[in-house]
Amino acid sequence: MKHWNLKRVLSLLLVVCMVTGLLSGVSAMAEDQTANYHEISTDGLKLATEDNAAADETETEEAPYADTDVVRVFVVLEDKPVLQQGYATRGIAGNAAAMAASKALEAKQAALAAEISANVLSGETLNVHWNLTLAANAMSVDLPYGKMDEVEALKGVKSVMLVPQYSIDPREQADLNTISSGNMIGSYNAWLEGYTGAGSRIAIVDTGLDSDHPSFNSAAFDYSLLVTSTKNGKQIADYNLLTAAKINEVLPQLHAAERYEGLTGNALYVSSKIAFGFNYIDATLDITHDNDQQGDHGTHVAGIATANRYVENADGTYTYADNGVVGVAPDAQVVVMKVFGKNGGAYADDYIAAIEDAIVLDCDSVNLSLGSAAVGFTTSGEAYFDNVMDSLDETDTVVCMSAGNSGN
């Protein structure tokens, strides 16, 4: 229990860092390693949750569609999702009762999909994108706009709403304050106490990763782990690293496997540093920025969290990253979940599917640094997504989502 609490403290440090967009790393540990803390008043702030939606949110009319237009919708079922049935996220893939509960929800979703196909779509097969059961009990499906009310009237259906889709805002530029952030969040002190993220798994749900970037070099990561384990009197095996074999063990529970036929743990495992990579928006293994126009924001965020503290030299030796970035948890593994790609911006159901996979993979922290400063409004689909995110507050996985990326 003590070990888990310490890991959770490190995860919370990551939350502080990522949601403020302050830290992409430091050149080296500053001479003054005393942490300075600044209290920030939250007086007058309110969260735009379902509970205060009437007071603080503006509900807009859904986009005008013709009845025959096919749209992507959430079909939310009445039963509670698995995590709201009292199951912990930690080790959930090995929890037989939790997995049985998930299968039971999937069975009801399958029966409902068959009913929709037969009675609403006149025998046409319903196209299902995701069957969500852990954080949400919902199917995301393609449906004629004019059929939404008919589906919502079916027994066992709680609600039907459009799935929000998000896009990268090209007006926003990286504006990171990195000089004093290490002191502000106390990462230097955490490192001095031995908390470097070793044994942690951090999921980045974003635009992907530059997998060839030296900040994520596996040899340098392995060297750093050796240094850390030796200093702490441990073996690298003590850190329970995510491996291809461990991914294979939970593969049947991963949404990624539903979208990619013949998927294996070896294909998802990139390296000891980049322990997992999947493209949820395009249903491919391409997690890079090379083949789309969605930008390299994901690499920036992954660097904030996990950039290595050593770089590999040409002669095979290693040097501290004096002239590069060092993440808050440099010894943590990064789990890359690309939700922006060739098919454009992510849908909210892609986010949830990625989060559920991160939970199955036993990630300690899940980051969605996807907020925008652009003025917007809340639709019913966005309110539902917010509610799903809020429900994760009570789990033992730290899930954080930024309110914006333009704070200064």
Question: Model-found features: residue ranges?
Answer:
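Hydrophobic core
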Residues: 14-22
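Inhibitory N-terminal propeptides of secreted protease zymogens
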Residues: 31-170
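Catalytic-core segments of hydrolase enzymes
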Residues: 212-214, 363-408
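Active-site-proximal beta-strand/loop segments in catalytic clefts of secreted hydrolases
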Residues: 76-80, 143-144, 163-165, 204-208, ...
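Subtilisin-like serine protease catalytic core
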Residues: 31-32, 68, 189-278, 282-347, ...
